[in-house]
Amino acid sequence: MKKIRIGQGFDIHQLAAGRELVIGGVTIPYEKGLLGHSDADVLLHALCDALLGAAALGDIGKHFSDTDARYKDIDSRKLVCKVHRLLAETGYRVVNIDATIIAQAPKMAPHISGMIANIAQDLAMPAGNINIKAKTAEKLGAVGRGEGIVAEVVCLIANSDEGEAQP
């Protein structure tokens, strides 16, 4: 019997001077970047959590600790590729992804197609099965004041063969 599972991921990072802004593996020209142990790619971190959660494999912190020097300043696309391998090892493939980025600035719309292309490549899936939306916080809260950026991701995974997937 085919198994399907859903996953949900959330991440938030503070904006800080002196950092590159990388979201969805795309470097976005901006005066600030996201603060974190890795490249702080808020979208890809939420994606990793959604995929790991769907497969009952824990979360990003379990697999890629922010105290582990191996992950200092790592390109989060490498983390997505590692999560993809973990899913494959348990018999799952990604069916679709729906994501929302919440940022007061900069505008994300010009960069969304690049984000989708990166995720499709890293997860070996059709770009047409990935949707990314961008919203503002309507100037409310820390995100609305431009202090940080949030990403939320939901995903659907299914076992890729006729047998039972082993979580």
From Swiss-Prot:
Protein name as annotated: 2-C-methyl-D-erythritol 2,4-cyclodiphosphate synthase
Pathway field: Isoprenoid biosynthesis; isopentenyl diphosphate biosynthesis via DXP pathway; isopentenyl diphosphate from 1-deoxy-D-xylulose 5-phosphate: step 4/6
Cofactor dependency: a divalent metal cation
Substrates-to-products reaction catalysed: 4-CDP-2-C-methyl-D-erythritol 2-phosphate = 2-C-methyl-D-erythritol 2,4-cyclic diphosphate + CMP
This protein's UniProt keywords: Isoprene biosynthesis, Lyase, Metal-binding
SUPFAM superfamilies: IpsF-like
Assembly and oligomerization: Homotrimer.
Enzyme category, top tier: lyase
Co-factor remark: Binds 1 divalent metal cation per subunit.
Lineage of the species this protein comes from: Bacteria, Pseudomonadati, Pseudomonadota, Betaproteobacteria, Nitrosomonadales
